Amino acid sequence: GSLNTFLNAMTYPDKTVYPVASCNDVDFKNIMDVYMDAVFYPDIYNKPQIFKQEGWHYELENEDDELKINGVVYNEMKGVYSSPDDVLSRYTCVSLFPDTPYRFESGGEPAHIPELEYNEFLDYHKKFYHPVNSYIYLYGDMDVQERLDYLDREYLSYFDADDVEIDAS
């Protein structure tokens, strides 16, 4: 197990953040590796079932049952869209920020999630989850240059800076 003191992932309309913290140097480096690998080299390219489990898929438990849509994100977003507070917050963002990414719900509208196809999902990842479109923040009692050199050597140097053109609108 990990000795982390904080580990999470959060999505926003214009970013995804992966904050981690550990008082143990070896554990911190391990968590950094896990996250860097998961973000820049995810299994989604080799295992389409991840998209089906996490995104959406059709499900039929018994042959007499009605065919239904299921999936982790799909079900989470159904919950978000049924919460009055979240509905109000969403309409507020649409009204205040009509020409920005904040007009969108980062998880997607449940009614439209089943329209997303696997290849579109992969294209989205290739475009937005790229080092040229990221910030990496380090803080704490560490040799920052050593960490930056490590991140460059093990991860960042394998990507070209001109691979991705970003338009957040």
What are these regions (language model features)?
Residues 1-169:
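Charge-rich, well-structured scaffold segments of protease-associated domains
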